[in-house]
Amino acid sequence: MSYQDEAMSNCDASHSLHRVRTACQTHGGGWEKCMVIFIDRASPGDANEVLALQKLAYQSEAELNGDSTIPPLTQTLSEIQSEYETKVFLKAVCGDKIIGSLRASQNSGTCQVGRLIVHPDYQGRGIGTLLMKRIEEAFSCAERFELFTSTKSTSNIRLYRRMGYQELYEEDLSPNVRLVFMEKRRCYEETRVWNT
């Protein structure tokens, strides 16, 4: 059992990794062909597909920041495979295709959330929000959640604010890329409800 499996078991959160069915809305471009989205725990066998999706989804971030060397675009298959040992990966599946993913790990009371990705054809339809909700459920005993995104990624920042995240500080990743770190704290009542 990995550290993350043990941490999640201690939080009694394994129930949230079962398949969750979510009805899709009808849209153009093939969206109507997908009647159900599954949110599942991703396995190491999904690493190749998750990495390909990551590189596709982060192209817009690279263009926005004028930097094609951002870590999501330079990550290797072996690097992402090694992350499965220390992080929980979720995937959003439509038909037989992974259309979204998110990963997280917990250290003490803080859950570090990272690499929220949704296929460009499926963005703006609530899949990112759903993945975020599921990862927060999975780490139900975390006291706080922390993540970061580019200061230029205004749509990401809006999403995280809607979900209760607040800006903490900013930090330069490179001459072209400035990151904003955000956090969400659970109040006592929310923690109590999630753990019942």
What are the functions of these language-model segments?
Residues 51-80:
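Conserved GNAT-fold acetyl-CoA-binding loop/helix
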Residues 132, 139-149:
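Conserved GNAT acetyl-CoA-binding A-motif
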Residues 123, 146-157, 173-177:
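Conserved beta-strand-loop-alpha-helix junction that forms the acyl-donor binding cleft
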Residues 129-130, 152-170:
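Conserved active-site alpha-helix within GNAT-family acetyltransferase domains
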Residues 79-91, 112:
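A short helix-loop-beta-strand connector motif used in the catalytic cores of GNAT acetyltransferases and
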Residues 122, 126-134:
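Conserved acetyl-CoA pyrophosphate-binding loop and the N-cap/start of the following alpha-helix
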Residues 91, 97-105, 112-117:
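Conserved beta-strand in the GNAT
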Residues 38-52:
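A short beta-loop-alpha structural element at the N-terminal edge
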